[in-house]
Amino acid sequence: MGKVKVERSEDADESVVASGDVTIKEEESYDDKLIFVNAIAKPMAGKKLAKKCYKLVKKAMKHKTFLRNGLKDVQTRLRKGETGICIFAGDVTPVDIMCHLPAVCEEKGIPYTYTPSRADLGAAMGVKRGTVALLVRQNEEYKDLYDEVKEELSALNIPV
């Protein structure tokens, strides 16, 4: 199942349930989002780990310099030596724009993971637009959650 979004629409299709003039469209499940994931999106965060990552992003968003988003910003921050946790979107096309970032993270010893949807990463930040890459730095206010996510990411098998 999932969350239910309410949209105003004239016509309805199979995935939309109509009730009067308001149609209710159900959000895609985690498994449905995995269909659109690229071949290089490994290690993929499980459902629970993805939820923890989104929660961490929400907490980091409250502090201005502790969350870096966007391909260009994350790329420059990694090159300049910032550390933290990298979260990448798995449904990016074309793949060539970000396929080098996992190698950079491995060189620098930064844990990283992929989540199924870039729209969900954007929603966790509180914006309507999706994002391709995030770099979350450690802060005292969410240290426990940060350490928990970092420990789970280091337990994931990084493909060679």
From Swiss-Prot:
Single GO BP term: germarium-derived cystoblast division
Entry's localization field: Nucleus, Nucleolus
Modified residues (Phosphothreonine): T23
Statement: the UniProt record of this protein carries the keyword ATP-binding: no
GO molecular function, one term: box H/ACA snoRNA binding
Domain of life assignment: Eukaryota
GO terms under cellular component: box H/ACA snoRNP complex; nucleolus; sno(s)RNA-containing ribonucleoprotein complex
Keywords, in A-Z order: Nucleus, Phosphoprotein, Ribonucleoprotein, Ribosome biogenesis, RNA-binding, rRNA processing
Phosphoserine sites (modified residues): S15
Disruption phenotype: RNAi-mediated knockdown in female germline cells results in a cyst differentiation defect that prevents progression from the 8-cell cyst stage and oocyte differentiation.
Gene3D superfamilies, sorted: 3.30.1330.30
Cross-referenced Pfam families: Ribosomal_L7Ae
Function description: Component of the box H/ACA small nucleolar ribonucleoprotein (H/ACA snoRNP) complex, which catalyzes pseudouridylation of rRNA. This involves the isomerization of uridine such that the ribose is subsequently attached to C5, instead of the normal N1. Pseudouridine ('psi') residues may serve to stabilize the conformation of rRNAs. Required for ribosome biogenesis. H/ACA snoRNP complex-dependent ribosome biogenesis is important in female germline cell differentiation during oogenesis.
PANTHER family: RIBOSOMAL PROTEIN L7AE FAMILY MEMBER
Subunit relationships: Component of the box H/ACA small nucleolar ribonucleoprotein (H/ACA snoRNP) complex consisting of Nop60B, Gar1, NPH2 and Nop10, and associated with H/ACA-type snoRNAs.
Similarity remark: Belongs to the eukaryotic ribosomal protein eL8 family.
Listed name of the protein: H/ACA ribonucleoprotein complex subunit 2
Record organism: Drosophila melanogaster (Fruit fly)
The gene coding this protein: NHP2
